[in-house]
């Protein structure tokens, strides 16, 4: 909607990245959408500085700025435009509870912009995660010919999420506003010992109020569909909105009920195992040597005297195979096949020469 900042510039840089050797044309839309503002909200004072927006967009790699007039967006007037209503299960909770009609206004104008511009890709920020989830659903349900990509939230040095509305904040209010990301970050730590929604939300509210912020909501939901949760389950979103003076701030943090999975890939001999083992040790994760698994299966195929290129002959060998990797977080893993330690045998030159052939078979993968 204009009022461009560092977060918008990151979106533009992402959109302008070369794809398949070609440099895409990056178009930035600027339109302060009246449909997504409720009565008494800040439509009239929302930041508008098209010259500054143009300069920031060009600096980040945009080739064009699309800033349509109200007449261009609403040829028959605002009241006559066809509205897009997202599912209430997505639009009426979190921010939608206190801003009725907001996401209908967002979806309507985004669809209108997509119709006018016809882009191949649409890049949007994750700061308003609910908006991103809703628009993904709208794009999917309407079969729109565009790929919607999310881009991680950009934050200032004070951890406050970049927002056009941050310029409403006085110096003192800006300092107070940092309590929101700080409270969510602390909740992420607390969730490891107490993953319950009630306790996490109450703790965040207490920290916000103690800092002088007025909470609007603090809720724990499933990240992909915004379904309310009673405790952290899988990929979970802890979302919050709070008022700092007259300004409404939103933020969120992702929580998980298990440790994350980190995969490192690269060419043979590049040091993947060394780097992955070190990373697992630093982060307290379990190191899983998938390369050793492929080597073990290759060793087994050789032991059975089967042609490494014959997938049909290999498949039966895997039916009752017992393959185990044993070891600690940072130690070398012991590889067992049917109870036999093959940790050393799988590193032989003979096995190494055949791994890529065996690993290419679907039954092995």
Role assignments for model-derived ranges:
Residues 264:
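Hydrophobic anchor at the beta1->P-loop junction of P-loop NTPases
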Residues 1-225, 253, 339:
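Nucleotidyltransferase catalytic core that binds NTPs
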Residues 272:
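Conserved lysine of the Walker
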Residues 269:
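Walker A (P-loop) phosphate-binding loop of P-loop NTPases
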Residues 11, 275, 279:
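Hydrophobic positions on the alpha1 helix immediately C-terminal to the Walker A/P-loop
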Residues 293-365:
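ATP-dependent small-molecule kinase phosphotransfer cores
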Residues 232-235, 244-261:
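Extreme N-terminal, non-catalytic leader segments
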Residues 280-290, 303-307:
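Post-Walker A helix-loop "phosphate-sensing" segment adjacent to the P-loop in P-loop NTPases
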